[in-house]
């Protein structure tokens, strides 16, 4: 049995136990894609087909994968939903830090991704792929992405939404304020006006020196002052300039602590791109097809993070990393463990369910 076939059959067995799709062949092809992405570390369909354990020619396998990403009966949101719900349920004992961010994928397309933060990793929950270039998108699209999250969240979970200045639109903030148990910490532009009493001024008019944090409670946001929120100015000693945040949290220092975590979604995109699966080089240009490819790539990513957690839990880190500390990320630990297990013919089971642990050491 080849390494490729071993990975594929193990993934297929687990997926058959977890998924029921409209056609049995869809699960089989999804298993091919996940296995090929992991073993080849590349999400380009031609590369995935070359890694697939099948007697068919690589070109024939590639055409099968292309038919799969074109298939209208495969709804990425529906297939991924049970995995996303399990992630949030596993983490719901603590406030859930959700982060929204966009990145370029495929050819001429962008993905707007909503993820939950855990152990310096952003775990994908849902996404929207659309035609466009890097830059701001519409508030309606932001709300559409967040609406996809609502049926995934546990009933009593506390949620804190994080995002950069692209997401500080009045329309989206009003939507978030209508949701029960949702808070937000979003970066905003220093040029935006706020109203405090009868005074209106740009945010950067408030005095702020390096090493300082200031907070203004219940200021009117923008010159229209359609909603009131808390404003935080934060100039950390590690930053060249100040950051300005709008938040529903009363504690400015807590808002800064939350916002510092926002940058962890960059690790997800780098794992999906240059450090991992190179999904930005997939050459696909249709948003719906890219969304289905992202389904396979996100499941592969989730497996690697869960595998990394298991490596730590079973105290096997020293076999693939330093013995005195953990240098590798959860994602990289997972990837390297699969390679190590295949090299030594060790048994493993693909894991797509997050196991939360309070005792986990601080890892990337």
Task: Indicate residue ranges for each PLM-predicted region.
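Short, basic alpha-helical nucleic acid-contact segments in DNA-binding proteins
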Residues: 68-83, 87
